[in-house]
Every structure is written in structure tokens, then in C-alpha cells.
């Protein structure tokens, strides 16, 4: 089994690439989705997050807007939050890998792959990248996203240039879905049949 780590900065189109891999019947571990499940009503991290960040839990689980507001006021809270979330994500990742070990290629979609130290868990890394003007346009068109919030999120991530330097594959996402799908097929063809490093 080859484990391909998929990452990219905010609004680069990583979710679209992840869906393309899934459409090719490749198992995809979606770290964002896992985190949402862990923070949903009855999610196993609710208690720990509620203790660390009072007032952020409601009937829908973790209220991400309230949590985000607390983190903007006290950025050191990011480390505390990551210390709660990352071990649970690692556990879920190990379960996913065990469940899918018979597949020749699995995709591990983790936005903070480099920043959170998940590179040791994958065999290869694909970085989704786009020109800055496209990235910014996509980001600020999202609900509840402002330019200052976008800049703050970018500041917490490795620069795109640095991610590209560490990548085994760079997926350029500045054109159209047809070009994007062709790159996904090319990477899949390159990796399937090779085995892990």
C-alpha cells in the first residue's frame, strides 16, 4: 500500500483534488471531516475542548465561530487545541490505514500535513497549488471569511513556495477541472504498482 499525503494551503482546491481521487475509487482519509466528527454533538473531543475553551460548546457541538473568536483573541490557544485534536486524528488515521491496507494507493488529505508533523505517516506528498490571486479570490468568497482572517490563516501555514519544495508531486490548480483531473490520473498511474518507499 502506498500512502499519498495530500496537502495545500487554504483555498488552493485541495478538497476538489481529494474528491477526484475518491471518484477514481481511491480511499481518502479526510482530516477536516474527521475533526468535524470529533467536534460534533456526542463527538469524543467535546469535553476536552469545552474544558480548554469555556463557552464554545452548544447543541451542535463545538461552535467554530466562538472557538475562532477565542483563538483570535489568544493565538496561543492554537497549541492547546492542536494538543487535543492531533492525537485523536492520528488514532483515526491508523484505523483508516488498517481498514484499507489491501488497497494499492490511499490518500491522506491533511491541510496541515507539514505543520503538524504528519509527513512521517506518508510515503509521498502531493501539494495542491494555485496562483496567489486565485487563492485569495477563492478564500474571501467563502462565508465568514475576511481578508484579515485569510491573512491570519496563511500566517499559521507554511508558505506555498516551501510546500512545493518539499513535495514529490505538485498539482497545479489554476486552470480547469479537466486539467486537474488529468494530473490526478497521472499521479495515480505513476504510483500504483510501485509500493511504498
Swiss-Prot record:
Chain positions recorded as ATP binding sites: 11-16
Main localisation: cytoplasm
Known EC number: 2.7.1.24
Domain DPCK, chain residue ranges per copy: 3-197
Keyword terms: ATP-binding, Coenzyme A biosynthesis, Cytoplasm, Kinase, Nucleotide-binding, Transferase
Residues annotated as transmembrane: none
GO molecular function, one term: ATP binding
Gene Ontology biological process terms, A to Z: coenzyme A biosynthetic process
Chemical reaction(s) catalysed: 3'-dephospho-CoA + ATP = ADP + CoA + H(+)
Enzyme class: transferase
Biological pathway: Cofactor biosynthesis; coenzyme A biosynthesis; CoA from (R)-pantothenate: step 5/5
Protein localization: Cytoplasm
Record Pfam families: CoaE
GO cellular component: cytoplasm
Domain of life: Bacteria
Family in the record: Belongs to the CoaE family.
Known function: Catalyzes the phosphorylation of the 3'-hydroxyl group of dephosphocoenzyme A to form coenzyme A.
NCBIfam families registered for this protein in UniProt: dephospho-CoA kinase
Name of the molecule in the record: Dephospho-CoA kinase
Gene: coaE
